[in-house]
């Protein structure tokens, strides 16, 4: 039992420092938050470790030289999607949470945009497992954003066999 507790403490460490807001040094804001909207505090080091795009962005001379808490707006995300994105970044990455599954489409796009291949892979698996007649065309379209052969083929064959099989 103690081993499981130790593992939980280890795996949940990043989520804990986010929840406690310890030593946060950057803010992320969703595109739908407006100028005075809510932002989510985070850690440059964690964002940089999870994403090459954040790493390049946060290592820029402009951000390094700033004495104030920098705010980065992720225009393409709504606030709830941003929360799910941050939740994933601070998680152990073993699976998508229920909250993350609710926003799987936007997280799939974010995984590609911010170069987090593992997030994109988990979202692809979730999208494929959730294929049904009502969303097959949407998923087929999503697979084109960056062309994703596995997602495309799954959606295409589902659609083809559902309607013509």
From Swiss-Prot:
Xref: InterPro entries: At1g01640-like, BTB/POZ_dom, SKP1/BTB/POZ_sf
The source's domain of life comes to: Eukaryota
Database matches in SUPFAM superfamilies:
POZ domain
Q: Which UniProt keywords apply?
A: Ubl conjugation pathway
Q: Which Pfam families match?
A: BTB (PF00651)
Q: Where is the BTB domain?
A: 24-98
Recorded coiled-coil stretches: none
Q: In which pathway does it act?
A: Protein modification; protein ubiquitination
Record carries keyword NAD: no
- Single biological process term from Gene Ontology: protein ubiquitination
Q: What does this protein do?
A: May act as a substrate-specific adapter of an E3 ubiquitin-protein ligase complex (CUL3-RBX1-BTB) which mediates the ubiquitination and subsequent proteasomal degradation of target proteins.
Relay the domain remarks. The BTB/POZ domain mediates the interaction with some component of ubiquitin ligase complexes.
Q: What PANTHER family does the annotation carry? A: BTB DOMAIN-CONTAINING PROTEIN, BTB/POZ DOMAIN CONTAINING PROTEIN, EXPRESSED-RELATED
Protein name stated in the entry: Putative BTB/POZ domain-containing protein At2g40440
Q: Which organism is it from?
A: Arabidopsis thaliana
């Amino acid at each position: 039992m103690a081993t499981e507790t130790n593992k939980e403490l280890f795996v949940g460490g990043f989520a804990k420092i986010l929840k406690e807001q310890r030593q946060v040094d950057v803010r992320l804001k969703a595109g739908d938050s407006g100028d005075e909207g809510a932002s989510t505090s985070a850690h440059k080091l964690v964002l940089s470790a999870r994403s090459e795009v954040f790493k390049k962005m946060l290592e820029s001379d402009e951000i390094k030289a700033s004495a104030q808490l920098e705010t980065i707006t992720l225009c393409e995300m709504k606030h709830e999607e941003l929360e799910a994105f941050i939740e994933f970044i601070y998680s152990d990455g073993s699976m998508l949470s229920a909250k993350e599954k609710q926003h799987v489409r936007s997280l799939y796009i974010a995984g590609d945009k911010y170069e987090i291949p593992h997030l994109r892979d988990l979202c692809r698996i979730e999208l494929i497992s959730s294929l049904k007649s009502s969303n097959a065309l949407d998923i087929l379209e999503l697979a084109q954003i960056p062309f994703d052969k596995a997602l495309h083929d799954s959606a295409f064959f589902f659609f083809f066999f559902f309607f013509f099989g």
